Amino acid sequence: MKVSVLITLAVLGVMFLFTSAEERGSDQMDSPAWLKSMEIIFQSEERECRWLFGGCEKDSDCCEHLGCRRAKPSWCGWDFTVGK
């Protein structure tokens, strides 16, 4: 039941977006710009270091107390150290 409600809300949201684009008199749908803005939202933020399970190439890419696990794909994992 919850899934069907979520799907219905998603469909209504998409219909609203396309309807509002038509009402503005736009010949082009704004979906590419809209999709690009959504992509920015879902991208991980650029940080000085990678958090747990983040992609890495070397140990210095990972945050403190994390090391680069070189199993494919490479990811940051706990290096078994503790402290401040």
Swiss-Prot record:
Cross-referenced SUPFAM superfamilies: omega toxin-like
Disulfide bond annotation, renumbered to this chain: C49-C63, C56-C68, C62-C76
PTM annotation (Valine amide): residues: V82
First and last residue of the signal peptide: 1-21
Gene Ontology CC, one term: extracellular region
Keywords: Amidation, Disulfide bond, Ion channel impairing toxin, Knottin, Secreted, Signal, Toxin
Cellular compartments annotated: Secreted
Family according to the record: Belongs to the neurotoxin 10 (Hwtx-1) family. 05 (F4a) subfamily.
Molecular-function annotations in GO: ion channel inhibitor activity; toxin activity
Function: Probable ion channel inhibitor.
Designated name of the protein: U21-theraphotoxin-Cg1a 2
Tissue-specific expression: Expressed by the venom gland.
Biological source species: Chilobrachys guangxiensis
Maturation propeptide residues: 22-47
Domain notes: The presence of a 'disulfide through disulfide knot' structurally defines this protein as a knottin.
